[in-house]
C-alpha cells in the first residue's frame, strides 16, 4: 500500500491554449474559480504535496498557494514536459499528474492508481475510460515512480513528446474509470457547456 504522503501531485497548466485562442486555459473561470484551482483543490486531499506546472502568468498561479514551476524546456513542448518538471521537483517516491482542464476527475483517482501500481508491481499506473466499447488510456492522468526521471529525460532528448509512447516502455498498469469524470475542456464553448450541464 502506498501512503498518500509519499505522493506529490502536479497540475499540468503549461499549455499554449491553442484551441482556446491562445488564452491561459488554467486561468479560465469555471463556477467562480480558475480551472487550475478546481484541479488543485480536487487533487490536494489525495496527495502529500502538490505543485502546479505553468509557463505563463506565474504570479496568478502562485496566488493559489502552492509551488509553481515552469517547463525546463522551451516552446511549450506539451504535457510530457510538465511531467518531467514534476519529476525533477518532487521529493517523494511517487508523482501523480492531472491536467488543469478536467475539473471533475475522480476523488479516488490517486488511491486507485496507487493500489493498482502496488498490486501489479508496476512503474506507471495510467487511468483509462471505456469509450465506444474499448478501453482508452488517459495518459496525462498517471502515477509514476520518480526514479523514472532519467528515463524520461533521455526519452525527451530524442524529440519524442507522447506520454503514452514513453510509458509503454515501462511496467505499465491501466486502471479503468467511468468516462464521465474525465470530460475535459479544450474550447471556450466546451467550458460554457460544462458549466451549463452542472448538477
From Swiss-Prot:
One of its GO terms (cellular component) is cytoplasm. GO terms for molecular function: GTP binding; metal ion binding; molybdenum cofactor guanylyltransferase activity. Keywords: Cytoplasm, GTP-binding, Magnesium, Metal-binding, Molybdenum cofactor biosynthesis, Nucleotide-binding, Transferase. CDD domains: MobA. Mg(2+) binds at residue 101. Its cofactor is Mg(2+). InterPro entries: MobA-like_NTP_Trfase (IPR025877), Molybde_CF_guanTrfase (IPR013482), Nucleotide-diphossugar_trans (IPR029044). It holds the Pfam family NTP_transf_3. It is found in: Cytoplasm. Monomer. Belongs to the MobA family. Transfers a GMP moiety from GTP to Mo-molybdopterin (Mo-MPT) cofactor (Moco or molybdenum cofactor) to form Mo-molybdopterin guanine dinucleotide (Mo-MGD) cofactor. This is Molybdenum cofactor guanylyltransferase. It comes from Leptothrix cholodnii (strain ATCC 51168 / LMG 8142 / SP-6).
Amino acid at each position: 500500500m502506498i501512503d498518500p504522503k509519499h505522493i506529490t501531485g502536479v497540475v499540468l497548466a503549461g499549455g499554449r491554449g491553442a484551441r482556446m485562442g491562445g488564452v491561459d486555459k488554467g486561468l479560465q473561470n469555471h463556477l467562480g474559480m480558475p480551472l487550475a484551482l478546481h484541479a488543485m483543490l480536487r487533487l490536494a486531499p489525495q496527495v502529500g504535496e502538490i505543485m502546479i506546472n505553468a509557463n505563463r502568468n506565474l504570479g496568478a498561479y502562485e496566488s493559489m498557494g502552492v509551488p509553481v514551476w515552469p517547463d525546463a524546456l522551451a516552446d511549450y513542448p506539451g504535457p510530457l514536459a510538465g511531467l518531467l518538471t514534476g519529476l525533477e521537483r518532487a521529493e517523494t517516491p511517487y508523482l501523480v499528474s492531472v491536467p488543469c482542464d478536467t475539473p471533475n476527475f475522480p476523488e479516488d483517482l490517486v488511491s486507485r492508481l496507487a493500489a493498482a501500481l502496488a498490486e501489479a508491481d508496476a512503474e506507471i499506473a495510467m487511468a483509462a475510460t471505456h469509450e465506444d466499447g474499448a478501453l482508452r488510456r488517459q495518459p496525462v492522468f498517471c502515477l509514476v515512480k520518480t526514479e523514472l526521471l532519467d528515463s524520461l529525460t533521455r526519452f525527451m532528448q530524442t524529440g519524442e513528446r507522447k506520454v503514452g509512447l514513453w510509458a509503454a516502455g515501462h511496467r505499465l498498469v491501466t486502471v479503468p474509470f467511468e468516462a464521465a469524470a474525465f470530460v475535459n475542456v479544450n474550447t471556450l464553448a466546451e467550458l460554457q457547456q460544462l458549466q451549463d450541464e452542472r448538477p
